[in-house]
Every structure is written in C-alpha cells, then in structure tokens.
Design a protein with these regions (language model features):
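Histidine-acidic metal/acid-base catalytic patches
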Residues: 1-6, 11-13, 54-57, 74-78, ...
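Catalytic domains of carbohydrate-active enzymes, especially glycoside hydrolases
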Residues: 11-36, 55-59, 95-104
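Glycine-rich, proline-tolerant flexible connector loops at the mouths of alpha/beta enzymes
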Residues: 34-50, 219
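Conserved beta-strand edge residues that scaffold enzyme active sites
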Residues: 36-37, 70, 110-111, 214, ...
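An N-terminal, globular interaction/scaffold subdomain
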Residues: 45-68, 85
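Acidic/aromatic-lined carbohydrate-recognition and catalytic surfaces
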Residues: 65-99, 103-123, 127, 134-145
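Extended, charge-rich helix/loop segments that form flexible
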Residues: 111-188
Length: 366
C-alpha cells in the first residue's frame, strides 16, 4: 500500500477550509482530525466521535489519523492522579478504534505546545508565515500567552495547546513543573507509554509522538524530542511497534543541525505519520516557515521524500504549516493552516513522489 496523503482539518465552524474545499485537492484521501473542544484528560465519547465521522465520511475521506488526543499535565508531571487520566486515555483509544482510527498523534511538551513570536510575519513576497524571533523568547511566558490570546479574543479562533482555559491559569500550570527535571519527564513519558501499549495492541492503534517545537528548552521547561539522539532513546525506551513517531520536519529542522532524511532512513518502520514542513533559517538563529518547494527553505524536502520512498513508506503524510497567501490573514485563516499554500504543497509532494515512482519503474525495465 502506498503512502497516504492527509490534510489537517479543525472541524465544522472551527476551520475556514471546508471538507468541500479539501475534496477538490487531488491526492488527499485522509482527514487528520480531532475533537478540538475536548480538554486534556477528558474521554472522547462515541457519540461525539460519530458526529465528526459522519461529516468526514460524507466526502469519501478516511479518518485514520487523529491529531491530537492531548496528554493531561498530571501525567507529564507524574502526580498520583495520573493513573486516572491514563485510564481515560485508554478509553479514548478504545472508542476511536470503533471508527477505524489507526494513528494517534500527540506530544509530551510541558505547558505549551508549539511556540512562535509572530503568527502572520511578512516574508517579502506579499505572503505571511509563522516566524520565530529568538531574542523575543525570554522568560516572560505571560507576554507570549497574551500575544497568542489576542488572536483568540479578536478573531474567535483557538489554537491547539493554547486553549484559553489553560492560558487563564498559567501560574498554576508552571508551579507543579518546577521539580520536574528532564530525566523525570523521560520517566513519566515511559510510564505513560508502557501503560498504554497493551490497549494499543488490543485496538490496533499506534501512538505517534510529535517532536518538540521548537526543539530546545523554553521558559525553563525541559524538552525531550529534539534531535536524532533523543529519538533513538525514545524508541528504544519502549521498544514496541505501536510506540511510533509523528516525524515533523519543521519542528526538527528549526535546529539546522538535524538531518531529517537520515532520521527517516534509520527509523522508517517506526514512523506512523509524517509532517512535511519547510524552514528558512536566519544567521542569528531566527527562522521562518516557508513554502514546501525544496529551494524555499533548508529542510531538504526532496531528500526527505526520497528517504520515505526508498524505505517503501506506507504510512500517512500531510502538508504541515504553509504560508498565508492572497486574501488569507487574521480573521479568515488559521496561522500556518491556510488553504492555498498547503494545497500547493500537496501537489509538490505528490509530484516528487510520482517522479520517484517513475524512476523506479524505469530502473526495473533496465
């Protein structure tokens, strides 16, 4: 079975890009979805899943990949209450398996999910993109949260990992993490996964961890999945075929020393889901997200796709963050999740894949 192309969709009334729009993009067969109104630790009930399933299936898409079932902070911190939330997570897995879900993407980042300093940064050609300015990331996490929340308040748009209910109690979230060292966070991640693996086997669902974004410590909080060595540790720590990766080229390549193609070749059999995102680096350590075409950034998109192709990858891939093009901007577009640049990215990736298929066919013919 060949690689399957997905598209992240935030749901009816929550995403300016409709399923009807997505249906018109050649090659997209899978909707990457979630119940975005659920808080970490809550059970995803069958009737809630059914409602979204009906919407997705009406357009002929599969719903094999969920992004994300977020992990409760008590699990990450290692509090005594974590077992209750792990049991809830297991029930989510069981309920999702009733709808044919094959992969759950998640992350284990403390407090914050992704972090950027500008959501609509001009990139010089009239488009805008997500931008990270290193000098703006100091120790003032409240200022960063206020910036993100300003978009929520002005445009009624929420962002995964930056939910208003969580941001309203930032100090409460930070305090329990004070004694959590990097090693303790590793221990808590292992505990979580070892508890889940029997349920994953029972239900046929792979847990696929997303790398930390950006891949370095911020606001004094430890980050785990940041480079090839930490990925090696993660996969060997719970050496189980259902303990997998969501390999995000954009998160990893925010550090230009990370070679994503090499990681794909080494761990292709443990990659369940791939995010393809291009990054343009600046000499001072800042970075901007870029178009998917190889020459628009320094991620090495062609080599990453070649690595997946050479490995016979049969999992799921989606275009990750693109630019905001033409009329897209605050109020009518989710940062990084516009319609046009991601659609262009899909066609670019499938074009590279088709060429690699053709070259293989010609080799076989001699």
């Amino acid at each position: 079975m060949p690689m399957k192309m997905g598209w992240r969709w935030y749901g009816e009334g929550n995403d300016p890009v409709s399923l009807s729009d997505i249906k018109q993009i050649p090659g997209v067969t899978s909707i990457v979805w979630a119940l975005h109104d659920k808080m970490p630790g809550e059970i995803w009930e069958v009737d809630e899943i059914q409602k979204v399933a009906d919407q997705i299936h009406a357009y002929g898409f599969d719903m094999d990949v969920v992004e994300s079932v977020n992990v409760h902070d008590d699990i990450k911190i290692g509090l005594p209450t974590r077992d209750k939330y792990i049991e809830n997570y297991k029930q989510c897995i069981r309920n999702l398996s009733k709808f044919g879900v094959k992969v759950i993407c998640y992350n284990f980042m403390p407090v914050f999910d992704w972090t950027r300093t500008d959501l609509f940064h001009p990139v010089g050609d009239g488009s805008t993109a997500l931008f990270y300015e290193k000098d703006k990331i100091k120790d003032d996490y409240k200022a960063m949260a206020e910036y993100i929340m300003s978009f929520t308040e002005k445009y009624n748009m929420t962002f995964p990992g930056w939910e208003p209910a969580r941001m309203a109690k930032l100090d409460e979230l930070f305090k329990p993490y004070a004694p959590v060292t990097k090693e303790k966070l590793w221990e808590n991640l292992k505990y979580f996964l070892e508890a889940l693996m029997p349920t994953c086997h029972e239900c046929g669902i792979k847990m696929a961890i997303h790398q930390d974004d950006p891949p370095w410590d911020i606001f004094g909080l430890p980050r785990l999945l940041v480079d090839a060595q930490s990925i090696d540790r993660f996969l060997s720590m719970v050496d189980d075929p259902y303990n997998c990766l969501t390999l995000c080229t954009g998160s990893l390549n925010a550090n230009p020393n990370n070679n994503c193609a090499e990681i794909v070749r080494k761990h292709c059999d443990r990659i369940a889901f791939g995010h393809i995102r291009n990054i343009h680096h600046f000499p001072n350590g800042d970075f901007s997200e870029a178009a998917h075409r190889d020459c628009c950034g320094e991620t090495g998109i062609i080599e990453v796709l070649r690595a997946y192709h050479d490995c016979g990858f049969e999992g799921y891939i989606r275009p990750d963050h693109g630019r905001q093009l033409w009329e897209e901007g605050p109020g009518n577009c989710r940062p990084g999740y516009g319609k046009y640049d991601r659609a262009l990215g899909v066609q670019y990736m499938l074009g590279v894949w088709d060429l690699l298929d053709r070259l293989d066919e010609e080799k076989k013919k001699g």
